Structures are given as structure tokens and as C-alpha cells.
Swiss-Prot record:
GO terms for biological process: protein refolding. Residues 1-35 are annotated as: Disordered. Its main location: plastid. This protein shows ATPase activity. Residues 15-31 have a biased composition (Low complexity). Pfam families: Cpn60_TCP1. Residues 1-14 have a biased composition (Polar residues). It is found in: Plastid, Chloroplast. One of its GO terms (cellular component) is chloroplast. Oligomer of probably six alpha and six beta subunits. This is RuBisCO large subunit-binding protein subunit alpha, chloroplastic.
Length: 583
């Protein structure tokens, strides 16, 4: 991080076009000449290893099996933990995507197969927030049975077509069978299951959503005590994320996380870096991160911010302002009051004339690619309540239904607050595991609210396997029909939940397959029962994403005919010891 003195002049900031950015150094009308160099550069690729046909597929399968075996251990309420040897103390986790991301295999070709399963887990985690282990196990099973068929002479392209068509039909069936979430009981059940049957976490997530709604729950924080608590703080969430992923400060979660950040709010478009150089200098001298909320940040300004962020000169992020037109200005006023109630936001004020005293302050800022959460200082509570009262008065007086709805949205964002889940534990290892479980529970709950719920415990996938024969009848090509059979075999791999609980998986699958939709096996209590009534439920979105992503990656593997990887470099021999020195 640059020191305050290092940014005393604008010329220190690196421009995306020049070595130095000099504020106002280029005279108006002055032309910058560029001279093409005559040098020619040749790039030499590393030596490669190439494998074809069965050899390539066997290497992929070996890597896929190793990673899927490790991830599959965690499946179900009685799944096992996995110890990850990382920097510092080992981490004990039960989270599929965390395990997948930590595994790198020594064999380059096998690692290529493992990377495909990592992609399944990561993509499912990004889209649904949970179900990564299920997606990994499904992908492995589809690939395993698919490669056997390819080796036996089946057309891989036709197999892929059959898999894709079958999965699409199953998703349509899933949408018909899912039901919406009904109150806090369902929310608690979903959160409890996703947290590894931890009822305390389930109750906490349900309590947080009950207090502020699903939009008000913020990312998880570490607590200074041993207890895990939910605290509702003044704040709001806006439906705009960072303009560029280069601003990310937490690469693992793809988030920007700031504390005690200064906030520049404007309804103008920022294109020239010289307009904000004074603000950048001041915030850097204060060692405070800067959040810029503007109509847009483009061109030279964006490029220069990104370059200096990557070089560690600036701690900054840019976000587009929410809304459009007059509504955008009103929402920016709301944000201004939340972050700095003592300073009125002057929309006519030019960005270059903004002083450090006119910037807002946010105690905590969390920004994803889709949303921004601001937690305000407690001192803004009185002004915030006054703003809410004003908006309620405007809503009461307006005759427009549209305006009334938009005012209601703004009131909800300002009054709902932000529920901060502060996680406590006795050790760092337990803290990390607990935070991962709460993150899964929170994401699964949002997914359930979005697309509804289905029976859990793997029962939904087993029940879906029974409709595949009817789907297969609509296919004419033999290899396309074989693709449907592959999906059917993969769906019953959820028997792994029973196996992890010490029960014969095939027997469990056989019983579930010929029972009603709601009935399934509860591995926690070792009983067959109505899973919806017992609270063993999964979000339909998680099941859908796991199935789609597994089929997508499996299709790519089945149509792969060769692998090209870097050839390992031979290890240099150890230097000989000097004469007379014993090693």
C-alpha cells in the first residue's frame, strides 16, 4: 500500500495509457504521437504431452474419481469431514466446494479431470449457493457410465444429446412437483438441512429472515466471543454490483469487502480520472477505502482505477447507481442520508468540486457482482427514521400506483436494516467450518424462497429417475435413448447418502423408487417417512442447478477425444557438497 506521501501528487497514479498520469500535464490541442516499434517477438510454448482416445478418457476418469470420492464423503446428514492441510493449522470442513477447490493432483492429465469437477462444484455454488457435493457426485456418475458406453462404440454426440434432452425434461417435471415455501417452519427446515442438521443455525437463519426479509441478510462475520448471534443494524442493499471484477478483495468468494469506507455519491458519469484525483489523494492519505457510486464509471477513469487497485496504490471500488432518471436521484439521496446524514447531497455539484467532508461513511461494505450491502454508522439512525417518515407521507399522498409501489420499495430497503450474523467458536478451525455451514444454509434458504422446495435426502432425484422411461420413449435414435439410461443410472447414485450413514444404499433406493413423491429415507433418524412433513427438504433451485451443471460438464467430457497438458520438467539434480563437507 502506498504511503500518504506517495500520493501527494496526481502524477503518481498510473494511467492505463501512459507510465504516469499527470493531471493537466497535457495541453489542450496537444497531440500525442505513437511510434510503432520494429521489434519482433516470438513466443515459444512449453513442451506438451498429448493423449488420445481411451488413454485420454482413462486419465480424465481417474482424476474425476479421486476428487469426487473425496467430496462424496461429505454427502448427507451423516457425511464425514475432510481435513485440509493449508497454511497454518489444518482446516476441518464438510463443504463440497471448499474441498474441491483445495485439491490439485500431481498428474497433469488426472488434474484436468479433477478441474472439470471443480468447475461443476464452483458453478453450482455460484448459481445456487449449495448442492455442490450432489452436483459433483452426479457429474462423476454420468461421466462414468457415459465413457463406458463410448468405449463400447456409442456415438458420444448422440449420447450428449440424449443426456441434455432428458435433463431438460426432468427440470420441467421438477418445476411441476416443487411447492412454494410456507412460512418460517419451511425456512428453518431448509437452513437446518443445509447446515448439516444443525438446528441452532436453522433457527438463526429463520430469525434473521423474519426480522429483515431475505434482502436484508448480509454476509457472515466473525464474532469476538464464543457465541453465534444475529444483530440487526442500520443499512440497506442495492441491486447493483461492482463494475469490474478486478476490484475484488476476497477472490475466494468474489466479493469486495471494506470497513469504515468513504462513499462518493453522484448522479453524474465519471470518464476522466482528473475529476476524482483530489478525492483519491485524500482517501489514500486517510488510509480509507473508497466506494464510488455514480451513473457510470468508464473509459480512462475506470481503467486507471483498476490499474492502481491491482498495483496496491488505491483501495477503491466503483458501482453503478441503482434505478433510472428521477428515481435514481431519489435512491441516491436515500444512500446519502444513510451514509452521511449531516451533509445534503447536491446533485448539481460537479464531481471535481467534491471535498472529503462531503463523502459519506459506511461502517461496512460488501459488494458482489449483483448487489451492494451498506451498513451505516449508528449515528445516522435519527435522520434515517426522518427520511422513512417523509417517504411514507409521499406514498400516502400520491395517486399513482406505480409511484406508490416504488416508494414502498425504498421504504422497505431503508427500514428493513441488515441482519449481521456474527459467528463465534472456541477455535479457528471450528469457526471456519461453522461459517461455511451458515453460508450454505443462508444460500439454500434464498434458493428455496426463489423456486420452492422438494423432498430432500436425495429422494427427489430417485423419484425423478422413475419418469425417465416415459421420456426415453419419445427418442428414436438408439444412442440418444442410451443417454437417457445414463442419466437414470446417475440419479440413483444418491444412495451414497445411505451408505455414508452405514445403510445399504441399493435397498434404500429400491424402496423409495416405488413410493409416493413425498416419501423418502431420513438418514438422520434411520426411518422412511413423509420428508416434507419431517422437515427434510431441499430447495428446488439447488436440485435443478446440480442436475444442469453435472450434465453440462459430463457432455463436454464425453465428446473429448484428446488431452494436451504441459510436460513435467525434470527435477534438477541436487548440487554436490563441497569436498570435505559431510551432508
Amino acid at each position: 500500500m502506498a504511503t500518504a506521501n506517495a500520493l501527494s501528487s496526481p502524477s503518481v497514479l498510473c494511467s492505463s495509457r501512459q507510465g504516469k498520469l499527470s493531471g493537466g500535464s497535457q495541453q489542450k490541442g496537444q497531440r500525442v504521437s505513437y511510434r510503432k516499434a520494429n521489434r519482433r517477438f516470438s513466443l515459444r510454448a512449453n513442451v506438451k504431452e498429448i493423449a488420445f482416445d481411451q488413454s485420454s478418457r482413462a486419465a480424465l476418469q481417474a482424476g474425476i474419481d479421486k476428487l469426487a470420492d473425496a467430496v462424496g464423503l461429505t454427502l448427507g446428514p451423516r457425511g464425514r469431514n475432510v481435513v485440509l492441510d493449508e497454511f497454518g493449522s489444518p482446516k476441518v470442513v464438510n463443504d463440497g466446494v471448499t474441498i474441491a477447490r483445495a485439491i490439485e493432483l500431481p498428474d497433469a492429465m488426472e488434474n484436468a479431470g479433477a478441474a472439470l469437477i471443480r468447475e461443476v462444484a464452483s458453478k453450482t455454488n455460484d448459481s445456487a449457493g449449495d448442492g455442490t457435493t450432489t452436483a459433483s457426485v452426479l457429474a462423476r456418475e454420468i461421466i462414468k457410465h457415459g465413457l463406458l458406453s463410448v468405449t463400447s462404440g456409442a456415438n458420444p454426440v448422440s449420447l450428449k444429446r440424449g443426456i441434455d434432452k432428458t435433463v431438460q425434461a426432468l427440470i420441467e417435471e421438477l418445476e411441476k412437483r416443487s411447492r412454494p415455501v410456507k412460512g418460517g417452519r419451511d425456512i428453518k427446515a431448509v437452513a437446518t438441512i443445509s447446515a448439516g442438521n444443525d438446528e441452532l443455525i436453522g433457527a438463526m437463519i429463520a430469525d434473521a429472515i423474519d426480522k429483515v426479509g431475505p434482502d436484508g441478510v448480509s454476509p457472515i462475520e466473525s464474532s469476538s466471543s464464543f457465541e453465534t448471534t444475529v444483530e440487526v443494524e442500520e443499512g440497506m442493499e442495492i441491486d447493483r454490483g461492482y463494475i469490474s471484477p478486478q476490484f475484488v478483495t476476497n477472490p475466494e468468494k468474489l466479493l469486495v469487502e471494506f470497513e469504515n469506507a468513504r462513499v462518493l455519491i453522484t448522479d453524474q458519469k465519471i470518464t476522466a480520472i482528473k475529476d476524482i484525483i483530489p478525492i483519491l489523494e485524500k482517501t489514500t492519505q486517510l488510509r480509507a477505502p473508497l466506494l464510488i457510486i455514480a451513473e457510470d464509471v468508464t473509459g480512462e477513469a475506470l481503467a486507471t482505477l483498476v490499474v492502481n487497485k491491482l498495483r496496491g496504490v488505491l483501495n477503491v471500488v466503483a458501482v453503478k447507481a441503482p434505478g433510472f432518471g428521477e428515481r435514481r436521484k431519489a435512491m441516491l439521496q436515500d444512500i446519502a442520508i444513510l451514509t452521511e446524514p449531516s451533509t445534503a447531497l447536491d446533485m448539481g455539484l460537479l464531481v471535481e468540486n467534491t471535498t472529503i467532508d462531503q463523502l459519506g461513511i459506511a461502517r461496512k461494505v460488501t459488494i458482489s457482482k449483483d448487489s451492494t450491502t451498506l451498513i451505516a454508522d449508528a449515528a445516522s439512525k435519527a435522520e434515517l427514521q426522518a427520511r422513512i417518515s417523509q417517504l411514507k407521507k409521499e406514498s400516502f399522498e400520491t395517486d399513482s400506483v406505480y409511484d406508490s409501489e416504488k416508494l414502498a420499495e425504498r421504504i422497505a430497503k431503508l427500514s428493513g436494516g441488515v441482519a449481521v450474523i456474527k459467528v463465534g467458536a472456541a477455535t479457528e478451525t471450528e469457526l471456519e467450518d461453522r461459517k461455511l455451514r451458515i453460508e450454505d444454509a443462508k444460500n439454500a434458504t434464498f434458493a428455496a424462497i426463489e423456486e420452492g422446495i422438494v423432498p430432500g435426502g436425495g429422494a427427489t432425484l430417485v423419484h425423478l429417475s422413475t419418469v425417465i422411461p416415459a421420456i426415453k420413449e419419445t427418442f428414436e435414435d438408439a444412442d440418444v435413448r442410451l443417454g437417457a439410461d445414463i442419466v437414470q443410472k446417475a440419479l440413483v447414485a444418491q444412495s451414497l447418502i445411505a451408505q455414508n450413514a452405514g445403510i445399504e444404499g441399493e435397498v434404500v433406493v429400491e424402496k423409495i423408487m416405488f413410493s409416493e413423491w413425498e416419501l423418502g429415507y431420513n438418514a438422520m433418524t434411520d426411518t422412511y417417512e413423509n420428508l416434507l412433513e419431517a422437515g427434510v427438504i431441499d430447495p428446488a433451485k439447488v436440485t435443478r442447478c446440480a442436475l444442469q451443471n453435472a450434465a453440462s460438464v459430463a457432455g463436454m467430457v464425453l465428446t473429448t477425444q484428446a488431452i494436451v497438458v504441459d510436460k513435467p520438467k525434470p527435477k534438477a539434480p541436487a548440487a554436490a557438497a563441497p569436498e570435505g563437507l559431510m551432508v
